[in-house]
Regions:
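Loop-to-helix entry and N-terminal half of a specific, functionally important transmembrane alpha helix
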Residues: 317-355
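Hydrophobic residues within the alpha-helical transmembrane core of Major Facilitator Superfamily
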Residues: 107, 139, 171, 194-195, ...
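Small-residue-rich helix-loop
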Residues: 256, 313-320
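Hydrophobic transmembrane alpha-helices of multi-pass, membrane-embedded glycosylation machinery
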Residues: 186-197, 212-215, 308, 376-377
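Hydrophobic, glycine- and aromatic-enriched re-entrant/interface helices and adjoining loop segments
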Residues: 116-131, 208-302, 322-326
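Helix-loop-helix junctions and helix-breaking kinks within/between transmembrane helices
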Residues: 41, 167-196, 226-230, 292-299
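Membrane-helix boundary/helix-loop-helix interface segments in multi-pass membrane proteins
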Residues: 2-30, 36-181, 345-360, 364, ...
Length: 391
């Protein structure tokens, strides 16, 4: 074990290439757009402005959300730099300890008395005015440790004795997140797991078993879901079922998106439906709706193109990796982003059930911003330490 760790530590001095510029540019663009979106969602367009330009916007903000988001971007950038200190294979050697810390955080948060609704997924600080969601950063830990576990197998996972330990590895943190009643984040964990399995390769018997088990689990779990969770699924299947109750969010979200039309009503402008607080959680879960109303179809198309470029770039990098461990890390990050993007945008326009997961780089939330930037930092580390140049 000591010899393997010394070997991993020496890797940091070998085959260090350049950071992936396309990935960095895409991430930077989405982060800047996200900061603008948070400011747009938290402004009072009717307030008297002080100054001109950006100072006019800042003087009309209704909360400190923009400043906190900016601060978390700074923390995330520091995380990217710190992640580059060691070769990613060093982190792989520490996978057992990283997994242990992640599980400890997921267990400790269950004992928090304060939560949001029935969800106990946050550590509160600063007298409860600020919070931190450990499951967000635990996504990175799960990606790293699962990649290390799966990479021990030279080829596709075709035997049950190979698959079961990997399944248990995933099931423990997945179950702890479900115990927090955070179904959205649990589904992200599931997407990461399935994405990494797909890239690693699976035998057809295991694929069939997963399909049957998944379908059976949905039937078995349904009666045990809270009425609120069931309503969200039923409202998705029948949008007109309860438009003034649990379907209220999606109803006004779709109205806001549609009212943006081709070019939008403009950023920081009066007369927006979302600015009148008809859209709940407008700077977090439903920030895409607010942004769509402001920038219209054209602006939304640009944002979606950037997200598509992000995911495609990640899967391309995963494909080009010579190292199986590195390829699986990038595949896990790509799967995480893909599910977040598809689910969040889908729920704002009624194509997916509402789960409450944020839109990467855009939704307000420090824990998620830190996790997103740390994930990008990990990918940059993998690419930088590959001997073969990735175009």
């Amino acid at each position: 074990m000591l010899r393997s760790r010394n070997r991993a530590l020496s890797l940091g001095r070998q085959s260090q290439g350049r950071l992936d510029v396309p990935l960095m540019l895409i991430t930077a663009a989405l982060t800047v757009i996200g900061l603008i979106a948070v400011a747009n969602a938290t402004i009072d367009p009717y307030a008297v402005s002080e100054g001109t330009g950006i100072f006019s916007v800042l003087s009309r903000l209704t909360s400190n959300s923009f400043y906190w988001q900016l601060a978390w971007v700074g923390v995330g950038l520091v995380a990217i730099v710190l992640i580059q200190i060691f070769d990613y294979r060093v982190y792989g050697e520490l996978a057992v300890y990283i997994f242990g810390v992640a599980l400890a955080l997921l267990v400790l948060v269950l004992f928090q008395t304060a939560g949001r609704g029935n969800v106990t997924a946050w550590f509160s600080w600063m007298g409860g005015s600020r919070s931190f969601q450990p499951s967000e950063v635990c996504k990175i830990a799960i990606i790293l440790t699962l990649a290390k576990h799966i990479s021990r197998y030279d080829g596709p996972i075709v035997k049950l004795k190979q698959f079961l330990p990997v399944l248990v590895h995933f099931a423990i943190p997945f179950g702890l997140v479900l115990a927090q009643d955070d179904v959205g984040t649990a589904l992200v964990f599931l997407a990461i797991f399935l994405g990494m399995l797909f890239v690693s390769g699976l035998g057809w018997k295991i694929i069939a078993g997963l399909g049957i088990t998944g379908a059976t689990a949905c039937v078995v779990i349904w009666p045990f879901l809270s009425e609120f969770r069931q309503d969200r699924v039923l409202n998705f299947l029948n949008p007109s079922r309860d438009t003034s109750g649990t379907g209220y969010q999606v109803r006004y979200s779709k109205i806001a998106v549609g009212s943006g039309q081709l070019t939008g009503k403009g950023l920081f402008q009066e007369g927006a439906i979302s600015q009148l607080d008809f859209v709940p959680e407008k700077h977090t879960d439903f920030i895409f709706s607010v942004t769509a109303e402001s920038v219209g179809f054209v602006g939304c198309l640009l944002i979606i193109v950037l997200y598509l470029a992000l995911v495609l770039r990640l899967f391309y990098l995963s494909y080009k990796m010579q190292d199986r461990f590195g390829a699986l890390i990038i595949a896990g990050v790509a799967s995480m982003f893909l599910f977040h993007i598809f689910e969040n945008i889908g729920m704002t326009i009624g194509l997916m059930p509402v789960t409450g997961i944020p839109l990467p780089f855009m939704s307000y939330g420090g824990s998620n911003m830190l996790a997103n930037l740390a994930a990008v930092g990990l990918v940059l580390n993998v690419v930088r330490h590959q001997q073969k140049t990735v175009l």
